[in-house]
Each structure stands twice: as structure tokens, then as C-alpha cells.
Amino acid sequence: MTAIVDIIGREILDSRGNPTVEVDVVLEDGSVGRAAVPSGASTGAHEAVELRDGDKHRYLGKGVLKAVEAINDEIYEALSDMSVQDQVQIDQILIELDGTPNKSRIGANAILGVSLACAKAAAISYDMPLYRYVGGTSARTLPVPMMNIVNGGVHADNPIDFQEFMIMPVGAPSFAEALRCGSEIFHTLKGELKKAGHNTNVGDEGGFAPNLPSADAALDFVMSAIGKAGYNAGEDVMLALDCAATEFFRDGKYVYEGENKSRSRSEQARYLADLVARYPIVSIEDGMSEDDMDGWKELTDLIGSKCQLVGDDLFVTNVNRLADGIRNGRANSILIKVNQIGTLTETLAAVEMAYKAGYTAVMSHRSGETEDSTIADLAVATNCGQIKTGSLARADRTAKYNQLLRIEQELDAQARYAGRSALKALA
């Protein structure tokens, strides 16, 4: 009854109005699993390839009809009549069907859509929530949300070089209360920015994009909003950064255009260490460029014992790159983005490798999202304890938070909010 009888790919729009892939997998028993694929703005050079049509007369070249065609023809033929419950075999067939190291022939967007839709169809067929189907009976940890409330970098049209300034409500007793805390700070920040004469338009991920001159200025506004909302920064709420340093790394220097300043590798490490000393920052993502391996080692040696250092562009959810980082002492955490690697099996393998090495894992969205809330279930399924899925605005972001609220309610007394235990520096 779990045999695949149909696979239907289609072109839909993401949160930026660009085309993306959606897939339905239909089973013999009538179960239908649906998955939509996200897309990034600041993408790592080593990510699996998102296949775009390149026809400038249609969606400015960003159409995904080639990927959809591969789903409806080649992938359907390869998986038709297979049992959907063998996720590992399905994903292996998809990888072999593509035949390239970076999934560039069929496209990681086509492969991921099918991989996730298969898992969702299987869960529906077994009448189980996705987090339970993937994670088993031990899946019960609700993640601490990393809420991106100030946007900069390529996610916003302002002078701030860092891409994201986030709050983490680690002191809340439950996920629902953490969400309330974040919402109250978000709305307080809006009022503070307005009062200071800044615009309160939001960026791709729902955070505000004020015209501020530096990271310090952004952090000061966030700190003020935390206090005025009635919370204690450093106790109830911690701060996190996504520097996205690859985006401003040029000719061996970190070029801060907003500040009209350049920093060497060592100066960049010391600058981040200084921010950690002056603000309650417990997590920094991509503090160094993706290929600045010496910089990553220097930063990890300098502050890795007191701050979570998350590799996104550095690792791109790839076990080979993660293994190299573990061997050489680079970073101490990995950002998990399903579309960076392209299949559910490979995603779960990266999480498992991180855990075994003592690294933390952070489940993450992309800046181009959809209403699909799969990553909320995967965060609980893997018990990773942290999720990064944007601000408290835009339905493509709140869809994930709302799904986590449902999961917490469903788990009831079994639910455990990760809180401070999610971060080794606080545990």
C-alpha cells in the first residue's frame, strides 16, 4: 500500500516572488506527501546546485521548468512502484540518477522536493506526524528559536554589513512562551526604531532593515528593545549573529563598506571576540569566509570555548566538509539547510556526524521560503535544540513557528523546551 504511483512536480513562487519547485508524491493507498523547496540569497560556493532554466524571457532566467520536467519524467520512472518507506534507497537512487557530485544535472531542487515529499507521504500513510516518523519516539525537544529581528547584508538594502542580528529566548519555560517573548521584543523594537526616525520596512526574512551605520548600532537597538519589553538580556534572552562574512571577504580582507573599514583575518577574529565580550552574544554564524580556513581556526581557538561558532557556507550541510572541519578544529556547530545538500538522508547524516563530534546543529530556513513547514518537524525529529527561521513577520516564517506550537501542544507533557541546554556555553 506504500508503493509510489505518481510523482507530480510543479513550478510555484517563493517568498521573494521567484519560481521554485513543489512536488506531490502519491501512494497506492491514496496518501499524498507535498514538499516545496526553498532558495537562498547568500549561497555557499560549495552547495548542491539549484537548477534554473536560464531563459531570460521567462522569470528573468529563474524558471524551474527543467527541474519540474526531470521530476515528472526521469525521477517518476526511476521511483514508480517503489515502497516509499525505504527513504535511504530512494535518496540513493536520486543521487545516482543525477550522477554528478553537486547534483547539477537534475538539480538539487528537484531531488530535494521528491526526497521530502516521499518522507511526508510515508508519514501520512502510517498516520504519524512527520517529526515522529523521522525521529521516532525520542523526538520531543522543542528548539530555541533564533529570531532574526534586524536584517543587513544581502538580505536588506542598508549599510549594515552583517546579515542577521538575532534574539534567542533561552530563559523561557516552553516554546510557546519563547515565541511570545520574541514577538514582544520584535514589536518593541519596531516602536524604538520608529521613535528614532528609522524606517520599519522588513527584509527577506521578516526582520527590520534600518539605515544603521554599524553592528554596534544594531546591537544597541536590540538590547534596548529587550529591556523595554521587560526581559533581561544575558539571562532571559541571548543574542546571535550571522555575519555571512563570505559576502564581504575580498582579496584576503574583510571589507566593511558600511563602516568604510577593512579588517585582516586576525583583526576580524579580534573584532568578533570584542563583540562577544561587550554583548551577550552566544552564537556567531559564518564569522569567517567559507574558504578562509586559517581564519576559522583562529576564531575557533580564540572564542570557541565561550561562543557557538556555526558553519553555514563553511560546511553547506555536507558530511565531507564537516568531517574536514572537525579534524582541523574549525567551528563547533553546523547550520543544517536541507537544500544545500539535496536529500533527507544526507541531511540526517550531517546532523548525526555533528552530534558524534560534540558539535551542535541548527536547523535552518533559507531567505527565499514558502509556506512549507517541514524544517519545524525536522528540528524536533533530530532533537537539535535550535531553529533559525526568521522573524515574527511574513507568513513564510511564521508557518514554521506555528507548526512548532502545534507540535508542542500535541506532545503535551512529553514536550521539552531546549532552553539554555541547547547551547554548550550556557549549559
Curated annotation (Swiss-Prot):
Annotated residues for binding of (2R)-2-phosphoglycerate: Q163, K337, R366, S367, K388
Primary site of residence: cytoplasm
InterPro entries named in the record: Enolase, Enolase-like_C_sf, Enolase-like_N, Enolase_C, Enolase_CS, Enolase_N
GO cellular component: a single term: phosphopyruvate hydratase complex
Keyword hit for Protein transport: no
Pfam families: Enolase_C, Enolase_N
Active-site residues, as the UniProt record annotates them: E205, K337
A GO BP annotation: glycolytic process
Alphabetical list of PROSITE patterns matching this protein: ENOLASE
Residues binding Mg(2+): D242, E285, D312
Keyword annotations from UniProtKB, A to Z: Cytoplasm, Glycolysis, Lyase, Magnesium, Metal-binding, Secreted
Job description of the protein: Catalyzes the reversible conversion of 2-phosphoglycerate (2-PG) into phosphoenolpyruvate (PEP). It is essential for the degradation of carbohydrates via glycolysis.
Protein name as it appears in the record: Enolase
Organism listed in the record: Bradyrhizobium sp. (strain BTAi1 / ATCC BAA-1182)
